[in-house]
């Protein structure tokens, strides 16, 4: 058997795509290896969201190439889509470049590359979605207590800071029956929890027997799977929130009381410049609606600091929004211009030192709220889903709370792996909880 090594960067959709690539390639006689130096085929599944993603890729490619000259090297993912032929110019030893929508063609690309000994590329946006081109055997093969399931891909929003519409294409929703079959297979393989994925997951509008279902209706349907205990979804857009999703949170106990809802800024001026097509007030109304229906619900978000034209007043509006919402956790980044996006063309770029100073202030507030939320759990007993992830200390195992907090307990008898266990929280830290199994 030949060795296959896949390195995945970026979002959960990339993790899902890497599993699909592994499954579509295995019939060619490949087995996954953990050491790139022992691989005959290396795939770098890339992300293009953060600054200097391409430069990091070329640095990594040089290291990979130095390990073993006779290996086949594939660049996949969003950098592959954005860079295209430029990858071959910068790294001539790369054999294949393939975009996210073309991974079903990987077997033929690999065969073609081996025969021609030349460069092979496919960064098309095919009319037939990639989900329809891959065989059923590629889906639902993940092992473990928590699994990813892509239900929607692509983006029609065209936020002025973002490359996703250009690298992932237009929004596409998979049919309900196809998703349900994959969910059944994942649960049969041991998944207690399913994470529904999409670039705009709550824009889901899948077909089912002549009807169009939204995300709320899909969740209620998937919840009928008897042995499935938890459902999550990510990532949502405020513009696509709808009534059936609110009601699903209120009525479906398997749906976790935690929503990742990126807002990016608290300034209406900046939100308009970002082409978000919602206001800070509308975002806060969504938060309030959720909390009225499900008082125990919590939120995380994404923030971009230093978008072109952002003033100190605009930034203070973001700080005020964070104070109002009080997030369980949040992710914040300095704005980095992405080539080809409208934001990159603007002349009113914010100085780097200003972005850095604002980011530190925002992260200080976010960290304070996260610690306070974690501290509020001390003394409570919460259900925690454990996997095979080990902690820093001997016999320690790590699981996830309903709110995506890392929870550490002692498992010296190896009893809790891949199970949901009631845990009494004894101590709170900045990004984790410590507890003991409660019987």
UniProtKB/Swiss-Prot annotation:
Signal peptide: none annotated. Keywords: 4Fe-4S, Cytoplasm, Iron, Iron-sulfur, Metal-binding, S-adenosyl-L-methionine, Transferase, tRNA processing. PROSITE patterns: MTTASE_N, MTTASE_RADICAL, RADICAL_SAM, TRAM. SMART domains: Elp3 (SM00729). It catalyses: N(6)-dimethylallyladenosine(37) in tRNA + (sulfur carrier)-SH + AH2 + 2 S-adenosyl-L-methionine = 2-methylsulfanyl-N(6)-dimethylallyladenosine(37) in tRNA + (sulfur carrier)-H + 5'-deoxyadenosine + L-methionine + A + S-adenosyl-L-homocysteine + 2 H(+). Its EC number is 2.8.4.3. Residues 2-115 form the MTTase N-terminal domain. [4Fe-4S] cluster 1 binds at residues 11, 47, 78. GO terms for cellular component: cytosol. Its main location: cytoplasm. SUPFAM superfamilies: Radical SAM enzymes (SSF102114). Its cofactor is [4Fe-4S] cluster. InterPro entries: Elp3/MiaA/NifB-like_rSAM, Methylthiotransferase, Methylthiotransferase_CS, Methylthiotransferase_N, Methylthiotransferase_N_sf, MiaB_methiolase, rSAM, rSAM_horseshoe. Residues 141-372 form the Radical SAM core domain. The keyword Zinc does not apply. Binds 2 [4Fe-4S] clusters. One cluster is coordinated with 3 cysteines and an exchangeable S-adenosyl-L-methionine. GO terms for molecular function: 4 iron, 4 sulfur cluster binding; metal ion binding; N6-isopentenyladenosine methylthiotransferase activity. Residues 375-439 form the TRAM domain. [4Fe-4S] cluster 2 binds at residues 155, 159, 162. Catalyzes the methylthiolation of N6-(dimethylallyl)adenosine (i(6)A), leading to the formation of 2-methylthio-N6-(dimethylallyl)adenosine (ms(2)i(6)A) at position 37 in tRNAs that read codons beginning with uridine. Monomer. Belongs to the methylthiotransferase family. MiaB subfamily. This is tRNA-2-methylthio-N(6)-dimethylallyladenosine synthase. It comes from Wolbachia pipientis wMel. The lineage of its organism: Bacteria, Pseudomonadati, Pseudomonadota, Alphaproteobacteria, Rickettsiales.
């Amino acid at each position: 058997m030949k060795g296959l090594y896949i390195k995945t960067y970026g979002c959960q959709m990339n993790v899902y795509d890497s599993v699909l690539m592994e499954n579509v390639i295995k019939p060619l006689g490949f087995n996954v290896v953990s050491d790139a130096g022992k691989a005959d085929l290396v795939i770098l599944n890339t992300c293009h969201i953060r600054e200097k993603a391409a430069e990091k890729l070329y640095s990594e490619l040089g290291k990979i190439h130095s390990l073993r000259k006779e290996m086949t090297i594939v660049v996949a993912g969003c950098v592959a889509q954005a860079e295209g032929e430029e990858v071959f110019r910068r790294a001539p030893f790369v054999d294949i470049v393939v975009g996210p929508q073309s991974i079903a063609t990987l077997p033929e690309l690999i065969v073609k590359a081996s025969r021609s000994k030349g460069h092979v590329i496919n960064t098309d946006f095919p009319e037939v979605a990639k989900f329809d081109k891959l065989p059923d055997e590629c889906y639902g093969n993940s092992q473990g207590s928590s699994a990813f399931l892509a239900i929607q891909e692509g983006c029609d929003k065209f936020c002025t800071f973002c490359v996703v519409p250009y690298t992932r294409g237009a929004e596409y929703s998979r049919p309900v029956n196809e998703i349900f079959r994959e969910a059944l297979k994942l649960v049969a393989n041991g998944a207690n929890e399913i994470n529904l994925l999409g670039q705009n997951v709550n824009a889901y509008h899948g077909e089912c027997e002549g009807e169009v279902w939204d995300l709320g209706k899909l969740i209620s349907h998937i919840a009928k799977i008897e042995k499935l205990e938890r459902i999550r979804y990510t990532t949502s857009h405020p513009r696509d929130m709808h009534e059936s999703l609110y009601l699903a949170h209120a009525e479906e106990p398997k749906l976790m009381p935690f929503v990742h809802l990126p807002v990016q800024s608290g300034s209406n001026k900046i939100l308009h410049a970002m082409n978000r097509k919602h206001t800070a007030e509308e975002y806060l109304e969504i938060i309030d609606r959720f909390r009225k229906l499900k008082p125990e619900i919590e939120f995380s978000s994404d923030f971009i600091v230093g978008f072109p034209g952002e003033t100190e007043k605009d930034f203070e509006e973001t700080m005020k929004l964070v104070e109002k919402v009080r997030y369980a956790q949040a992710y914040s980044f300095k704005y980095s211009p992405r080539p080809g996006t409208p934001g990159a063309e603007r002349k009113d770029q914010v100085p780097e030192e200003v972005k850095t100073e604002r980011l530190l202030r925002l992260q200080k507030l976010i960290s304070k709220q996260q610690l306070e939320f974690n501290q509020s759990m001390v003394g409570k007993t919460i259900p925690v889903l454990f996997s095979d992830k080990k902690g820093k200390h001997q016999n320690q195992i790590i699981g996830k709370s309903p709110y995506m907090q890392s929870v550490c307990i002692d498992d010296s008898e190896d009893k809790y792996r891949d199970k949901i266990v009631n845990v009494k929280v004894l101590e709170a830290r900045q990004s984790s909880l410590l507890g003991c199994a409660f019987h």
